[in-house]
């Protein structure tokens, strides 16, 4: 009887929604839909009351002498579940077929999950996002992050980064769909209580519209299933999550592209985007704007063997310079623009017990190669913090990466991020032109799984990098980090499940700092910190 009451209650609330969704045209405004929903609710209530009364008459309580059942672990199941802890598995929706009463019930069952998806699809609006925030304190005053891109993130980041995406379907008829997408990202300061955007002391509080584009399906006859987009958007990013930088990243001021175009066994992503840069002179005080354009091409999801896929990628960036810009480079001390490229491949292997590992190989030249040589963050940018400078001479850099997670038995999981890279005759932002470098960084994160909601573990990070300048002088940078943590989670995966709340204690030490001269507070080369951090996406 309890279950019937719940279903009946769900009928009163949900059935009018399903009824109206089938009968309304998508051209109606939200206000018109609400008005019709209210009307449908009033009309349906009387009919449902009659249906409820009939159900009550059919139900005759019976006294049955039965033993208390037990579950698989031997504990007695509760024979009298409380109503406050339960919710219906399904709702009933009214069928609109004219002959429904002749063939059977005029109602059919729909799970709450399916019904929620139906309402969401009917509205055509979604709100997605990400942010992290937390508290921390350290042994020498204010805690400082160091070399996150080499030592790992746990217990080593004190920023409040966010991404917020709004997506609205504006057309969906005759096999064609159009969506409007806007994304904002930025950072909220975690040091001072006030965090007004524009009042940017310390560079903490900022925000931008990173995406603003229209994406469509069904308009291209040769690729009806692909996503065709126009606007401020770039090719999809691929991240080394534990190090917080990207192996694939093409920023864009505006562009046009195609994603998930099925060709042969795999899919093609292609993007043509604009990303102008500020070209500086040798004093780094004066700048000029240079128009650059990037083509990013990827052939992905190529099946290899069981649960293994391959991606092949290529990217080329070229400038569209005016005569005056070239004259400034030739005669006024501005750095010459040099076209730059990157190509490579990646292999992703999923495991039977859950988890995955991704291996990538990338080669780049000129300014992208310069960013391969950065130890703190190594995303493949064409600039350094938005500034283009340096005598690039065609030097190249190579990068090999591994990242993923694996389950060991029922109660252990290990995540990893390992990067080996080297370069020859590149421009280094620390040691100048004609530099060589070699680096290795490794982070492992084993943990004990108590249950679905709790893990305890340690993140261990180490890196070392050596640069050699044009005069063969050597400069070394190295350090290590140990972070003990306990996390509250909603699933056991370390890399793919959020939200997550972390409690941590971190010891971090700079062994050598000849590239950046970094120190913690009080000129110390080490730091002990404790804190808590929340990270969520939806």
Curated annotation (Swiss-Prot):
The keyword Electron transport does not apply. GO terms for cellular component: cell outer membrane; pore complex. Disulfide bonds: none annotated. Gene3D superfamilies: Porin, LamB type. Residues 1-25 form the signal peptide. It is found in: Cell outer membrane. GO terms for molecular function: carbohydrate transmembrane transporter activity; porin activity. Residues 62-73 have a biased composition (Polar residues). InterPro entries: G_neg_Bact_CarbUptk_Porin, LamB-type_porin_N_dom, Porin_LamB, Porin_LamB_sf. Residues 52-82 are annotated as: Disordered. GO terms for biological process: monoatomic ion transport; polysaccharide transport. Keywords: Cell outer membrane, Ion transport, Membrane, Porin, Signal, Transmembrane, Transmembrane beta strand, Transport. It is a multi-pass membrane protein. May be a sugar porin with a broad carbohydrate specificity. Belongs to the porin LamB (TC 1.B.3) family. This is Putative outer membrane porin BglH. The gene is bglH.
């Amino acid at each position: 009887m309890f279950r019937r009451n719940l279903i009946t209650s769900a009928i009163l609330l949900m059935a009018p929604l399903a009824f109206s969704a089938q009968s309304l045209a998508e051209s109606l405004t939200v206000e018109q839909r609400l008005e019709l929903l209210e009307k449908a609710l009033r009309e349906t209530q009387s009919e449902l009351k009659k249906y409820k009364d009939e159900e009550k008459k059919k139900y005759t309580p019976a006294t049955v002498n039965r033993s208390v059942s037990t579950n698989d672990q031997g504990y007695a199941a509760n024979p009298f579940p409380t109503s406050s802890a339960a919710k219906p598995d399904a709702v009933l929706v009214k069928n609109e077929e004219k002959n429904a009463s002749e063939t059977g019930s005029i109602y059919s069952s729909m799970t709450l999950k399916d019904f929620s998806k139906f309402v969401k699809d009917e509205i055509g609006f979604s709100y997605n996002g990400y942010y992290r925030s937390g508290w921390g304190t350290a042994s020498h005053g204010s805690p400082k992050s160091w070399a996150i891109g080499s030592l790992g993130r746990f217990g080593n980041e004190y920023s409040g980064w966010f991404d917020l995406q709004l997506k609205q379907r504006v057309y969906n008829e005759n096999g064609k769909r159009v969506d409007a997408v806007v994304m904002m990202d930025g950072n909220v300061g975690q040091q001072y209580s006030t965090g007004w955007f524009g009042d940017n002391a310390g560079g903490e509080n900022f925000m931008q519209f990173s995406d603003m584009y229209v994406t469509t399906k069904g308009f291209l006859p040769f690729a009806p299933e692909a996503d065709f987009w126009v606007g401020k958007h770039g090719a999809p990013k691929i991240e080394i999550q534990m190090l917080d930088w990207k192996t694939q990243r093409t920023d864009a001021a505006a562009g046009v592209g195609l994603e998930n175009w099925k060709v042969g066994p795999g899919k093609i992503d292609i993007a043509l985007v604009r990303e102008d840069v500020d070209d500086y002179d040798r004093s780094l005080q004066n700048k000029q704007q240079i128009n650059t354009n990037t083509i990013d091409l990827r052939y992905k999801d190529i099946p290899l063997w069981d649960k293994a896929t391959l991606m092949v990628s290529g990217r080329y960036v070229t400038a569209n310079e005016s005569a005056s810009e070239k004259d400034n480079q030739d005669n006024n001390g501005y750095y010459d623009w040099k076209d730059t490229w990157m190509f490579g491949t990646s292999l992703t292997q999923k495991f039977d017990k859950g988890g995955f590992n991704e291996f990538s190989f990338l080669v780049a030249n000129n300014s992208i190669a310069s960013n391969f040589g950065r130890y703190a963050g190594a995303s493949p940018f064409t600039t350094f913090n938005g500034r283009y400078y340096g005598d690039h001479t065609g030097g190249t850099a190579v990068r090999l990466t591994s990242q993923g997670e694996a389950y060991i038995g029922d109660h252990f999981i290990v995540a990893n991020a390992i990067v080996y890279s080297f370069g020859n005759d590149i421009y280094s932002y620390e040691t100048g032109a004609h530099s060589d470098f070699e680096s290795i960084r490794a982070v492992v994160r084993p943990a004990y799984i108590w249950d679905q909601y709790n893990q305890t573990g340690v993140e261990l990070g180490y890196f070392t990098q050596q640069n050699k300048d044009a005069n063969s002088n050597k400069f070394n940078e190295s350090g290590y980090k140990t972070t003990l943590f306990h996390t509250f989670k909603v699933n056991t995966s370390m890399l793919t499940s959020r939200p997550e709340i972390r409690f941590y204690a971190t010891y971090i030490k700079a062994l050598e700092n000849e590239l950046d001269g970094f120190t913690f507070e009080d000129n110390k080369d080490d730091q002990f910190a404790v804190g808590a951090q929340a990270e969520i996406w939806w």
